[in-house]
């Protein structure tokens, strides 16, 4: 019964529909992003290891995914929590393509297939992020714009500075992948600790931050 209720809960809150654009917080300068896009830090295609952070910069920095969110407000929350007061960040507006996979839907498929509670735990930890992961990175022509902000700290609306449109942007009738990304069975000793990074781009090493907002705030205050 508990498993049935969990599946109903996840189905209700998961992203069956998606927005026209996705969003990504980063400290990478707009000019650089418009030239090269977002390149992943490595070739590890294990989505679970990216979500949990073991293949990001808090781990071995080998992830082949780039994180985005279908929620613009959530991208702002994460940026404001992680960026020190007075420092700039960019909010990128991105057109998704078939290499974008929904993390919650993929975790749910793995949970249903394996009945492994670690997938269930990860869903409940991160479903609020409305995350879509771009396998292999994000091309420059997919980046519509970059909005520059100056942080005022956690729970404070950042100061808007300017919006920059990408001259290389190409508009196309495309959307993210409607299927689930296959996540292999976990090893017996696979960690389920809540520690992960949403950056995982080779140009973003200075912007490493935990994805849990509470952890973000604690880290920012240090």
What are these regions (language model features)?
Residues 15-222:
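NAD-dependent ADP-ribosyltransferases
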């Amino acid at each position: 019964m508990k498993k049935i209720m969990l599946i109903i809960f996840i189905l209700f809150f998961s992203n069956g529909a998606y927005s026209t654009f996705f969003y990504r917080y980063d400290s990478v300068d707009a000019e650089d992003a418009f030239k090269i896009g977002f390149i992943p830090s490595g070739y590890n295609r294990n989505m679970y290891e990216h979500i949990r952070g073991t293949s990001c910069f808090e781990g071995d920095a080998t992830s082949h995914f780039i994180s985005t969110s279908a929620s613009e407000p959530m991208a702002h929350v994460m940026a404001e929590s992680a960026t020190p007061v007075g420092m700039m960040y960019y909010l990128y507006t991105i057109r998704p393509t078939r290499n974008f996979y929904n993390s919650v839907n993929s975790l749910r498929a793995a949970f249903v297939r394996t009945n492994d509670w670690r997938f269930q735990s990860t869903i409940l930890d991160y479903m609020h992020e409305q995350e879509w992961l771009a396998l292999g990175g994000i091309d420059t022509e997919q980046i519509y714009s970059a909005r520059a902000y100056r942080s005022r700290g956690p729970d404070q609306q950042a100061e808007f500075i300017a919006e920059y449109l990408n001259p290389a942007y190409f508009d196309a009738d495309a959307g993210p992948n409607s299927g689930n990304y296959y996540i292999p069975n976990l090893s017996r000793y696979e960690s389920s600790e809540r520690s992960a990074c949403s950056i995982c781009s080779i140009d973003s090493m200075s912007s490493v931050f935990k994805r849990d907002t509470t952890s973000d705030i604690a880290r920012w205050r240090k």
